[in-house]
Amino acid sequence: MAEAVVSFGVEKLWELLSRESARLNGIDEQVDGLKRQLGRLQSLLKDADAKKNETERVRNFLEDVKDIVYDADDIIESFLLNELRGKEKGIKKQVRTLACFLVDRRKFASDIEGITKRISEVIVGMQSLGIQHIADGGGRSLSLQERQREIRQTFSRNSESDLVGLDQSVEELVDHLVENDSVQVVSVSGMGGIGKTTLARQVFHHDIVRRHFDGFSWVCVSQQFTRKDVWQRILQDLRPYDEGIIQMDEYTLQGELFELLESGRYLLVLDDVWKEEDWDRIKAVFPHKRGWKMLLTSRNEGLGLHADPTCFAFRPRILTPEQSWKLFERIVSSRRDKTEFKVDEAMGKEMVTYCGGLPLAVKVLGGLLAKKHTVLEWKRVHSNIVTHIVGKSGLSDDNSNSVYRVLSLSYEDLPMQLKHCFFYLAHFPEDYKIDVKILFNYWVAEGIITPFHDGSTIQDTGESYLEELVRRNMVVVEESYLTSRIEYCQMHDMMREVCLSKAKEENFIRVVKVPTTTSTTINAQSPCRSRRLVLHSGNALHMLGHKDNKKARSVLIFGVEEKFWKPRGFQCLPLLRVLDLSYVQFEGGKLPSSIGDLIHLRFLSLYEAGVSHLPSSLGNLKLLLCLNLGVADRLLVHVPNVLKEMQELRYLRLPRSMPAKTKLELGDLVNLESLTNFSTKHGSVTDLLRMTKLSVLNVIFSGECTFETLLLSLRELRNLETLSFHDFQKVSVANHGGELLVLDFIHLKDLTLSMHLPRFPDQYRFPPHLAHIWLIGCRMEEDPMPILEKLLHLKSVYLSSGAFLGRRMVCSKGGFPQLLALKMSYKKELVEWRVEEGSMPCLRTLTIDNCKKLKQLPDGLKYVTCLKELKIERMKREWTERLVIGGEDYYKVQHIPSVQFINCDH
């Protein structure tokens, strides 16, 4: 539906003109003329979209409109930015600046007239083809934010309620993995959308499976995988604390993984393996010795038998009509108000038949219709399905058009802003886990969402849009069970195909995978019309210097190889809003000074990049909203004192290491919502006083000021939700300092203290809603548990690296009433831990790591009946012997579904 996409751009342009009307004073006639033509154009778009399939000329006109809107936006913003820069050049250049000002205004007026003329020509052309004006329907519709407030009252992201007909299949697969010693490989094969990954995930997390195996790994094998990456991810899952894995070459990885799999019982899941050749590329690490087991999912039915002739090959059945209806009804009814009209069962069942028994299609259709509140709306969807889908049931891999159409319907039903949010997911590679915080910053940087007008944060606004896509079953999400906030999202590969197809159809994105020439394009898309460029290979970095990209608005890079890039500069990308250079290794460690020419930039990331020198021209980027300077930790980074110019910043991550003489003035960054790696050595703590919008703050305390002064500088930060203190010089904090630390932060939920804190504050000094606390290297002499267990809202506690130096720790009856996760790591002096009956009644996960003097698990652990997962890491072999079936302490853990021993002494 191109009309919605084009209309969104037109509306954004109208907003820009209205918002900046005061600064455009003096050229009112040209601006008013442009706005009039935009209004006329808007009224033609709906009819043009309805007739776009009748003639290519209409489609071309719609593409012209998108180009015009982008060009107009670029022209207006460039003028406003250049005018602002002119005002800042000082008195000495006043006369020259005035002359330039007049010239710029005349040129801008001429450019606006040119845009208006182009719109007029499009309008005339459309009308010559019979395109008619259609007035807006009138009546106020709820904004997306208002609709989200309603949705959040009833919408649950719990996918368990969407599972139908899997119980028997899950039990069968579990039996073969756990009980059948003659089977080493189990495969689940079938067409896309039939539920292979869902089934595998249920098996992977099954209580019996978690209990049986010593370790687990889940790796998605995309069509563009590398052998090294797959081996690396498996080994990282099985040895999570081995930091050396990232540096291993293929030969070392192969040897380490082969030896590890020979030594224990491990379950490996390779999800979405496409070809037999893919298996052949990675199979060298899997020993013939029994013990480890493999669960494969693939569309290729013969893959499992190719991997292992004794493989148990399982093919999920499509849902029966009854199961399809049950799943559909469950989704629709769980997301609707009970007072709404009764679902027309006959009409609903007919629509469900077009899903061909595929769970994905049923869930997407259910998510679509759950939002339709009237019989008329249901009839419209029904009519759309009947009109466009031929054939009612029975699908094969060669005949999935009807399923594709069902998935497309959900896209077509999206509001126009959500279409852009959905399109943006096309940037990411297949099976990619998308960090939603980064995704939200992309959306904001491109103006797709605008969180700032009502005081909401980027995170809150982004979540409301993403939840709409989740509710429609267009994306799947991974959320923290501790915070219930979404952390990652992904698309099913069939939905991704829809997303890519629609995004390319609208010229929204150009994807470059492995180019062979500097002019490589995909699907013959015009580089001038695709304003977003995504590189899925580091070998394509040279394309950033290509002249065809001069109108690009975003550049994202994935799959960066370990080699240096020598950029020619960024002159060919003058209109960029988003530039993500994460993991890119710059030759010589220098970011080119031409980065300062990208004056439209809103998002810049150098996360884990090989950069050690930043140019002073960075200060030209006055529109930046997100700046991530979290380069590779090993690098000492020269940062010029120009960040103070970026007064629109909402997110700032500073490098961990900077030269001793570096001083940064940050006091004017009053819009910051998140500030990471703020060092008292390189910045003044008084700069924090005015950052009252901060919700996330990470401070590195290095002794240049007193801790009391630091705390006083934080007193106005009433919106803080996450606060971290890191004292790497181990300066002991006075007792009253610890009390002041948390006294006033009434909204604080997450607290990290990595510092000497010999005396712990009492529970009355902690904020009322504190949910998560990390204590690292605090060297407390008294047991902190009597205080921590009285914090009624605590959900997670992490004690690490000498947080407590005592020998005995006690968790009392009634303590920690809401605690879900407890981790104790590197408590080298702890000998005895006692848990009383009635303590930690809700605990779900417990990790004991490298507490070598701890004699045994507490007897009271047998009373913690909610415990689902126990991890014993880097402990003595005696622990394993005592806790396995038949062991001396087995009775303490026999109720826990998953007990894992990781890197324990052999």
Curated annotation (Swiss-Prot):
Ranges in a coiled coil: 15-68
Entry superkingdom: Eukaryota
Repeat (LRR) residue spans along the chain: 573-597, 598-621, 623-644, 646-671, 672-696, 704-727, 740-766, 767-790, 791-818, 840-865
Residues binding ATP: G190, M191, G192, G193, I194, G195, K196, T197
GO MF entries: ADP binding; ATP binding
Keyword list, A-Z: ATP-binding, Coiled coil, Leucine-rich repeat, Nucleotide-binding, Plant defense, Repeat
Short name of one Pfam family: WH_DRP
Residue ranges constituting the NB-ARC domain according to the UniProt record: 144-454
Organism: Arabidopsis thaliana (Mouse-ear cress)
Primary role: Potential disease resistance protein.
Protein family per UniProt: Belongs to the disease resistance NB-LRR family. RPP8/HRT subfamily.
Gene Ontology biological process terms from the UniProt entry: defense response to other organism
Protein name per Swiss-Prot or TrEMBL: Probable disease resistance RPP8-like protein 2
KW ATP-binding (keyword) present: yes
Keyword Signal among record annotations: no
Domain remark text: The LRR repeats probably act as specificity determinant of pathogen recognition.
Underlying gene: RPP8L2
SUPFAM superfamilies xrefs: L domain-like, P-loop containing nucleoside triphosphate hydrolases
